[in-house]
Amino acid sequence: MKINALLSAGLLVLGWMLGLGSAPCDAKERDPRPREESVVQLALLLDTSNSMDGLISQAKSQLWRVVNEFHGARQHGRQCVVEVALYEYGNNSLSAGTNYVRQILPLTRDLDAVSEALFKLTTNGGEEYCGAVIREALDKLSWDKDANTYKAVFIAGNEPFRQGPIE
């Protein structure tokens, strides 16, 4: 139940990202030629603080289920190519100077690498700065500028979004 609420919060972040946070696609930036592939870009943000001890396995499974849903998606009659980035946050083994945020993988099409990295994550400690990890994903990933590319951020954590220096 708690994880479903967390993923629902991730969908709220998605709306924010698509409306405000993604790189703007000005008409002059768009390529008028049709793309040969339909692309889906996902950023997975996972709270690895100690407060996630009892939830971490379920959170990983839910995030991976999201990836699998998009992996089977079609757009304009074509199978979508899925690119996934992975972040962890809230882990005391991460630097306070990075707001306890670490990019594990940039956007990649290697879903085996994403799965391996995701399921290796463990919990430790806890300063869960949701705003910082969201900002990092929005600002630092190489998001496709094509307006037809579906871009989404999914965050799984159990703390309020207002913690930390970035709200």
Give each language-model segment a name:
Residues 23-167:
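Divalent cation-coordinating acidic motifs and surrounding scaffolds
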